[in-house]
Each structure stands twice: as C-alpha cells, then as structure tokens.
Amino acid sequence: MIQPGVRDRRQRRLLIGLALLFFAPLALAFYLYYGPGTWRPGGRVNSGDLVRPARPLPALALPLLEAGSTDANFLKRKWTLLYVQSGACADSCRMRLYDTRQVRLALDRDTNRVQRVLIAGDGCCDAQFLHEQHPDLIAIRATPAAAPLLALLPDRDQGSAAASLAQAPRVYLIDPLGNLMMVYPAGSKAKGMLEDLKRLLRLSSIG
C-alpha cells in the first residue's frame, strides 16, 4: 500500500511535469526572441518590432460593436492579431483587415490558434462589410473601458481612448498568455507577419 505522503509527492511531481511540458515550448520561444544574441531560426530576423520586455495586457470585458461584450480573458488562450482604427475604415484600413485575414487563413491547420481583434472608434465599419468579409473578426467598440488596454500599446497616446485611436495604424501581436510582444508598423508586409507567426507557432505548443 502506498503511504499518503509518497502518493502526494508523486502527484506533485506529476503536476510539475505537466506544467513544464505545457509552458516550456512558449518559454523557449520567448528566449529565442528576447534572449541574448537575438537568435532567429535560419538566421532570419523577425519582421515586426519586438516589445522588450513583453507587456502584460489587462483582463477587460469590452463591448462589441454589436450586442454583448467579450470575455475578460479574450486576449488569452490564442495568439492575437490586434488592429486599432479610428474614424471610417477607408482603403488602408480595409487592406490591413484583408492582410490579417489572409495571414490567418494561410496558417492552414494552425488557423484556429490565431484570432483577429479590431478595436474601432465611432463610424469605423459597416456591419454588412464585417459580416461578409470578416466573419471571424472580434470587433470591439472603443469606449473609455478600453483606455487601460490602449494606453499600453507602444507609440500611442497615454490619455483618452479617443486620443490613442488617432495614432498611426499598427497591428499588434499578443501571445496566448495575454502579453504584447510585437508591433507591425503601418506599411509592414503581410508576408513578414505570416513568417513570424509560423515560427512562433512552430516553437510553441500553447495557444
């Protein structure tokens, strides 16, 4: 008969082993991207701008453009491509949404490991356009509730949500633990974004 103390120690070791198995690949991915020497697979550099150190983003339940709101942890569990838009979604905005959609679809069997999020100001997007062209998009209304999140995005105004929305459009990459880790400036290519995501997904088993 196994003594209770021995059984408890075995269970603890098993739980520790499972935790290491789950988180070690993501830790490795972070080390390779943020660690000394800035090593990259195949000697290639990432296309996005690294956020050093990665920034934990707040858990917030935010209102959707239509009815309802997000779960407070909606930026966790998956890799997230976040785009922020103020005013009407003109050609440059539509092209950015198109790029992120195509990048996600090009991941093939890993498509479901990535989600797309839009934070939009008043008058941004036509509901029919979003339904027809971007049915997978999580479209969030930029209210004051989003200000703590927007304030943590690099190169954005630290004041109101409206002021932050007025900055140049970028795509932000968030890891499955809710950390902002990379920024794609306006004009960056979708191909580079895709290559970065493929490498990260290959190195990480979570999300």
Task: List where the protein language model places each region.
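Short active-site neighborhood of thiol/selenol oxidoreductases, capturing the structured segment around
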Residues: A72-T100
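N-terminal Sec-pathway targeting helices
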Residues: D8-F22
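Structural signal for membrane-spanning alpha-helices in multi-pass inner-membrane proteins
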Residues: A29-Y33
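N-terminal Lys/Arg-rich, disordered targeting/topogenic segments
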Residues: M1-R9
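Thiol-/selenol-based redox modules, centered on thioredoxin-like
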Residues: G159-G207
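Structural microenvironment flanking redox-active thiols in thiol-disulfide oxidoreductases
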Residues: M95-P135
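N-terminal "domain-start" segment that seeds a small globular fold
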Residues: I16, A24-A27, G37-N73
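Short, internal strand/loop/helix patches
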Residues: V117, D122, Q128-P169
